[in-house]
Amino acid sequence: MPKVGMREIRRAQLIDATLRSIDEAGLPGTTLASVAQRANISTGIVSHYFGDKDGLLEATMRHVLRDLWSATTRRRVAARKDPRSRLRAVVAANFDDTQVSAPVMKTWLAFWSQSMHDPMLKRLQHVNTRRLHSNLCAEFAKALPRTKAREAASGLAALIDGLWLRGALAGGPIDTRAALKLAHDYIDLLLASD
């Protein structure tokens, strides 16, 4: 008889091992066997929980996305209610510690690349993109006309992605302070122009 709660513990253990494997070996070097080895379990158990490598990557990205969405919610709730503060909260969530560790950043890069070829991952990316744009647009709409709010949201989303991508590819820890300053300056510029 399986232990109560063991399924979630085991899944979390395997997702962590997947993040570490992608960090160390990249997506091509990440196999069910490499994940099993890092988790000190059999390959059969990995297959039991995730089916195949695609299922494992999907579950790992769902985990990373949940962390992002949790950080976004937590920071928006804690922020003052004015649009500037709430926009800054959304930006900060994208540079949250849960999103800028080397294993997570490399997994994001692998996910983006793979999402161009995998319909399920493409759908996850589409949901994430829409959620970011919606959060930004809702806040900009409190201070700008609708069309300007949409344009501002698209611009800030592109800036977030660009700053994050440059940071991920820089070869060292991401300078979140510099990224946040640039994004905050952009928000201030957009809100001051109205």
Curated annotation (Swiss-Prot):
GO molecular function, one term: DNA-binding transcription factor activity
HTH tetR-type domain residues: 8-68
Pathway membership, UniProt: Amine and polyamine biosynthesis; betaine biosynthesis via choline pathway [regulation]
Example GO biological process: glycine betaine biosynthetic process from choline
Keywords, sorted A to Z: DNA-binding, Repressor, Transcription, Transcription regulation
A Pfam family assignment: TetR_C_6
InterPro entries: BetI_C, DNA-bd_HTH_TetR-type_CS, Homeodomain-like_sf, HTH-type_TetR-like_transc_reg, HTH_TetR, Tet_transcr_reg_TetR-rel_C_sf, Tscrpt_rep_BetI
Disulfide bonds: none
Transmembrane segments: none
DNA-binding region extent: 31-50
Stored Gene3D superfamilies: Tetracycline Repressor, domain 2 (1.10.357.10)
Function: Repressor involved in the biosynthesis of the osmoprotectant glycine betaine. It represses transcription of the choline transporter BetT and the genes of BetAB involved in the synthesis of glycine betaine.
HAMAP family for the chain: HTH_type_BetI (MF_00768)
NCBIfam families in alphabetical order: betaine_BetI, PRK00767.1
Name this protein carries in UniProt: HTH-type transcriptional regulator BetI
Organism: Burkholderia cenocepacia (strain ATCC BAA-245 / DSM 16553 / LMG 16656 / NCTC 13227 / J2315 / CF5610) (Burkholderia cepacia (strain J2315))
